[in-house]
Each structure stands twice: as structure tokens, then as C-alpha cells.
């Protein structure tokens, strides 16, 4: 079955594609031994919410497994999970010996794609899990970033930006994976030149509980970027100087007018240059 079944068409919904592939050639539901089933090697999720699994287990204890898991046979009587790992983990926690399953014949590319899309649609992945899943699919060389973006409902730039997180040191990736720092924190660390700087700043973020804005400010310090001097700070000074000059000029002119009104014949001239105002007052010695 070609990988294009999932990534070659635009008009169908992602989950419809998965359901159609799973339904095609569906065999009857079988009860498979739990010890003959192993997790999906392409499972993008590396951290499972144990509280949610426990909640699911309580539901299964009362109602049973309503929706069978989907598997593929890897060796005679050994099966890999395609979809339903949370159900498998919940049943495992209940120490049940068997689980209802549907066996499908899918290749690696289709299994990887289904695992990614199922998680994106049904439960949020961490940014690192999502990035690694994208890389896994692209490394199979069966799909372009653009085609992948169309099928998972993302923009090509969103996928590219997500994958940039994989350029960070493993220590930083683990911090994102474990939700010790946010994706925005991690993105800001990409501005630093070396892994040593990135790991060192990660420690500072944890120690000081910095938010993203504080982290970005610290990065500017590390990079030696000087903040531009705000022009607004100098405007009041220039305005004050201009205002003082006008007051001085008006005061002089008023004084000259007052003297003229008292009968004194004055010759008043003013000249403006780039650097100063020049005022000349000539007072005749004789009337």
C-alpha cells in the first residue's frame, strides 16, 4: 500500500485517511495475548500522562475495551501496535492477559504517519516529540515538507521551525520534553552561538525562573548587543531648548517695543544661522 495514501491527497481529512486505511481489508477482531504485543517503534510520544492512563484503566475495568487496538504482525504471533498504545498501557496496568485487536498489513511509512497524525489529532505532543516525528517521516524520503504540512494541517514554515528545535543540545531538548522550559524559551536559545552557551543559559533560566522576555534580555547581554538609545529621551531636551530660545527672543523683542513706545528710535535686526541667533540693536546717540 503506497505511502501516498496518507500524503498524496489534499481533499481528505487526516483522520478519514487513517480510518480508511485501517478499515481496508479489516479482519475480525481477535483477542491477542498481551505478552505478544510490543509498542510502535515510530511512536512519537515519549512521555505518557500516567493520570490519563489510570483514568482510562478505570473505565476499561468497568466497561472493557470498547475500541480494539490496531496492530501489524511482525513475526509469527508477534505484533506491533499501530494505533491504541494508551489503551494497551491501560490494559497492561490492569494485568489483563489479552486485548481485542485488529491485525492490519501496513508498511513502516504508513505506520509512522498514522502514529504521528493520531497523536496530533487526539492528544497534544510536546514540541520535541512533534519535531522528531516530522524528522522521522522526512528521513524516510517518501514525502516533502510541503506534502507533510498539508496532511497534518500545518504550514511548511511551522514544520521547519519545529524541526529547528532539534539543533539544540540534548540537555535543552530534554528540558522542553519534560516541560521545564517552554518552546519559546528554547527558540530563543537558538540565537546563541555555541552549545556551551545554550546549556549554561538553560541552567540560569532554571535557577532564576526567568520568563521568555528575561531570557531574551540575557541573550542580548551574552551576545553583546547594545540597546539603541531611545530618541524619545532626547526630544524633551531639544523641545526645552527650543522653547527657551523662543522665550528669550520674545522677551528681547518686547523690551525693544517698550523702549520704542517710550519715544526712543531703535534700529533692531536679527539674523539666524545654523548655530545661533544674532540680534543687533542700534541706539542713536542723538535724537
UniProtKB/Swiss-Prot annotation:
Q: GO molecular-function annotation terms? A: DNA binding
Mind listing where the DNA-binding region sits, in residue ranges?
A: 146-165
Q: Which organism is it from?
A: Listeria monocytogenes serotype 4a (strain HCC23)
This protein's superkingdom?
A: Bacteria
Q: Which Pfam families match?
A: HTH_ParB, ParBc
> Which keywords does UniProt give here?
Cell cycle, Cell division, Cytoplasm, DNA-binding, Septation
Entry's Gene Ontology cellular component terms: chromosome; cytoplasm; nucleoid
Name the gene.
noc
InterPro entries to which the protein is assigned, alphabetical: Chromosome_partition/occlusion, HTH_ParB/Spo0J, Nucleoid_occlusion_protein, ParB/RepB/Spo0J, ParB/Sulfiredoxin_dom, ParB/Sulfiredoxin_sf
Q: Where in the cell is it found?
A: Cytoplasm, Nucleoid
> Which SMART domains has this protein been placed in?
ParB
* This protein's name: Nucleoid occlusion protein
